[in-house]
């Protein structure tokens, strides 16, 4: 019997703490252990997971799924032995998409991804804006990330309170 899939939001209230790097490395490490892993760039405004994974030239991305222009299966790419869902790098429609993103739609997409994987790691955006709250709320678990500075610890604590 297959274990219940795990969805983990990797989050922090502060930028520059290593969320994206941790998401990529944890995903690759789990994949190297034979686990079925998907990683999703939940940072719609400042997407970097695709860059780190060497996938900055993807034709379609998570933004296309959110706007209804693609199906989730169209934006799952294989890299380093894991599945990667990059957000993309189009600047012209990011703010428009952000203003229209509904928590229910993100949860629906997360549900579709969870049917296809054992671990779903979500690289959440920094801060506590709507996009961050949606990324954290859509996951079943949260892994808070901070650096050893007082502002980072306070911001991490605030973010942890959202889960």
Q: How should each PLM-predicted stretch be described?
A:
Residues 3-6, 33-36, 80-81, 116-118, ...:
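Short coil/turn connectors at secondary-structure junctions
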Residues 11, 50, 63-66, 73, ...:
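Conserved protein kinase catalytic domain
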Residues 15, 42-44, 89-90, 125-127, ...:
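Short, ordered loop/turn segments at secondary-structure junctions
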Residues 23, 99-102, 152:
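Short, conserved glycine- and acidic-residue-centered signature motifs
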Residues 39-115:
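P-loop/Walker-type NTP enzyme "switch/lid" segment
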